Curated annotation (Swiss-Prot):
It is a multi-pass membrane protein. Keywords: Golgi apparatus, Membrane, Transmembrane, Transmembrane helix, Transport. The chain crosses the membrane at residues 49-69, 107-127, 154-174, 192-212, 246-263, 328-348, 369-389, 406-426, 429-449, 465-485. Pfam families: Xan_ur_permease (PF00860). One of its GO terms (biological process) is guanine import across plasma membrane. It comes from Schizosaccharomyces pombe (strain 972 / ATCC 24843). This is Putative xanthine/uracil permease C887.17. It comes from the Eukaryota. Its main location: Golgi. GO terms for cellular component: Golgi apparatus; Golgi membrane; plasma membrane.
Length: 625
């Protein structure tokens, strides 16, 4: 037997041991004995899938800091024209310090949120400050160098409050209900619109490749000029497409990454970013990010430390707690709406991809816990100075690699924790290294357009409006609002005409319309809330979890340890009978308690009712907390 085969056999044996342990039953690994064990899930496969997800989303450490630093953060500037602040050496150095804080903060909150999402919600997703949400935070709410309607400190407070509001909405089940009641085509259009939004950011000169620039006559124009020919308003004074940084980012960060992705290379995104970054580190290079200037020297001195744990100096608990005026309320409401749509769409898509969605209720396992973890992560992230935290669409790479449980999320969290000690490296990643990444991520998010119902204009037009207005208004919120208003207007008018004409005047393709109703199956309140109201003292326990524990106890009672010759020793008939009698008594007591609180539906009936077509998993809506 070869060494490879021996290692493979050892891994398989270890997977079986882990699956049969309490750890395996908690995460519902295949072979654990849980009624809703997740088919195909193995411990070793979850570890590999977690690493794949981290490599796919590790770019957020650089990209999130690059986007949020444009707000200016807590740096002070008294210039009337905030664009002139970038000409002040003290302000520029302050922003560089702010950028380093953001790298540490992003790693910290990503580690905490991903680990908790995996441990408590058992969801195979990675968490981090969301792309699109951070752009909205930076460019729509706070503005470049603080030119927006709300200051950076006030925006952090809005995010902090938003998280607690989300927690309340989750407890009463309203957040899950909103996720299920949104028309399907608008859900898919939201992801595509955010993809186009990210694409524009990736092509821009401030946070990307610089392929496009400003034009006073045409709004946007061709860019790509060297830094010495780039005007303050990001328009080019000639020499378009002659920037070495842009071409390095396109070929090394874009073309190479795309080819690696076509070959299903794990970590393709990270490889492209790493290549462009390493190319930009030599100081004598034409594309260096450490030119011999005041800022370049300052950055290079920090970069030379390589390994260093950096404390968060400027943005830790930076909220402005005494706020007045309507602009804060507008920012809070907008964050609520935008984040609930973004998180809902992403988390639902990942749960569906992993086969965890119940096709009848359109809810997924652990939805209540997942939304609560997300909500608390949003508030904690604001204390670290970050924009709202959300589930990452790149989690799909880990799911496609076989990830099905929360072990994937825990691995992602551990990897982000390790990255905390390499802040000088991660804070020295240039924007042209991540610009192509944003474009590629945007292209992947456009895949959701294939799921839009293009057969009926009442569904397709609102979806298209949503997609188009997000990048063209440079606002996710405006696109979502326009899409929902358009959907309600068109379909309400058609519905009224249909009723008034008694069904004689209907569109030719009306039978192609997606079914929609506000009455979602499964009700509004989560199952654990219902058990609480019915007087169940152990309302937090899922009945299937109790049954799994009973089965595990029975299995341990009917087996003994292996003897030296490798054969199992059988237990006596009296021991087995006594154990089975005890377990039957425990089960009868549990059933009587369930009947007392009005839960008469048996497990077998629920198992027959909930069949998911995605991964062959018998499951029910799970709202464990």
């Amino acid at each position: 037997m070869s060494i490879t085969q021996k290692v493979r056999n050892w891994v398989e044996e270890f997977d079986v041991i882990v699956a049969r342990s309490a750890f395996g039953r908690w995460f519902r690994l295949e072979g654990c004995g849980h009624p809703r064990e997740r088919k195909g899930s193995r411990f070793s496969l979850e570890i590999s899938a977690g690493l794949t997800t981290f490599f796919a989303m590790a770019y957020i450490l650089a990209v999130n800091a690059t986007i949020l630093v444009d707000t200016g953060g807590t740096c002070e500037c008294t210039e009337a024209n905030r664009d002139d602040c970038d000409k002040l050496d003290d302000y520029v150095l302050c922003k560089e310090d702010f950028h380093r804080d953001l790298v540490t903060a992003t790693a910290a909150i990503s580690a905490l949120a991903s680990f908790c999402m995996g441990l408590f919600a058992n969801m195979p997703v990675g968490m981090a400050p969301g792309m699109g949400l951070n752009a909205y935070f930076a460019y729509q709410v706070v503005g470049y160098n603080g030119t927006g309607r709300v200051s950076y400190r006030e925006a952090l407070l809005a995010v902090f409050v938003e998280g607690f509001i989300f927690t309340g909405l989750t407890v009463i089940g309203l957040r899950q209900w909103l996720a299920r009641v949104i028309p399907a085509s608008l859900k898919f259009a939201t992801g595509a619109g955010i993809g186009l939004y990210l694409t524009i950011i990736g092509l821009s000169p401030s946070a990307g490749l610089g392929v496009i620039g400003h034009s006073s006559s045409d709004i946007v124009a061709l860019g790509g000029c060297p830094p010495e020919y780039l005007n303050a308003d990001y328009s080019c004074n000639g020499h378009q497409l002659q920037s070495g940084r842009m071409w390095v980012g396109i070929f090394c960060g874009g073309v190479l990454t795309a080819i690696l992705m076509m070959y299903k290379f794990k970590g393709a995104v990270l490889a492209g970013i790493a290549l462009v970054t390493i190319t930009s580190w030599p100081r004598r290079s034409l594309v260096t990010m450490f030119p011999h200037t005041l800022t370049g020297d300052y950055n290079f001195d920090f970069f030379k430390k390589v390994v260093s744990f950096r404390k968060i100096n400027r943005i830790l608990v930076a909220q402005q707690w005494n706020v007045t005026g309507g602009q804060f309320a507008i920012a809070l409401i907008t964050f609520l709406y935008v984040d609930i749509m973004d998180m809902t769409g992403t988390l639902y898509s990942m749960a569906n991809y992993a086969g965890l969605v119940d096709p009848r209720t359109q809810d997924f396992e652990g939805s209540a816990v997942a939304y609560i973890v997300d909500a608390l992560s949003i508030s904690i992230g604001s204390l670290f100075g970050c924009s709202p935290v959300t589930a990452f669409i790149e989690s799909g790479s880990g799911i496609s690699a076989g990830g099905r449980t929360g072990i994937l999320g825990m691995v992602v969290g551990i990897c982000f924790f390790i990255s905390l000690f390499f802040a000088p490296i991660f804070s020295s990643i240039p924007v042209w290294a991540t610009g192509s990444t944003l474009v590629l991520v945007g292209s992947m998010m456009m895949k959701s357009t294939t799921l839009i119902n293009w057969s009926y204009l009442g569904d397709s037009i609102p979806a298209f409006i949503t997609i188009a207005l997000m990048p063209f208004t440079y606002s996710i919120a405006y696109g979502l609002i326009a899409g929902i208003i358009c959907y309600a207007l068109l379909n309400s008018i058609i519905y009224a005409i249909d009723k008034m004409s008694r069904g004689r005047l209907v569109p030719a393709d009306y039978n192609q319309k997606e079914a929609w109703t506000w009455r979602v199956e499964g009700g509004l309140l989560p199952q654990w809330v219902r058990r609480l109201f019915k007087g169940n003292r152990r309302f937090w326990e899922d009945p299937d979890d109790r049954k799994a524990m009973d089965n595990a106890t029975l299995e341990m009672a009917t087996s003994r340890s292996y003897s030296e010759d490798g054969k199992n020793e059988k237990t006596t008939h009296e021991d087995v009978t006594m154990k089975e009698t005890s377990l039957k008594k425990m089960d009868d007591e549990r059933i009587s308690v369930d009947e007392a609180v009005g839960e008469s539906e048996s497990f077998s009936n629920r198992q027959q009712d909930f069949r998911t077509p995605y991964a062959g998993i018998d499951m029910d809506t799970d709202d464990r907390i």
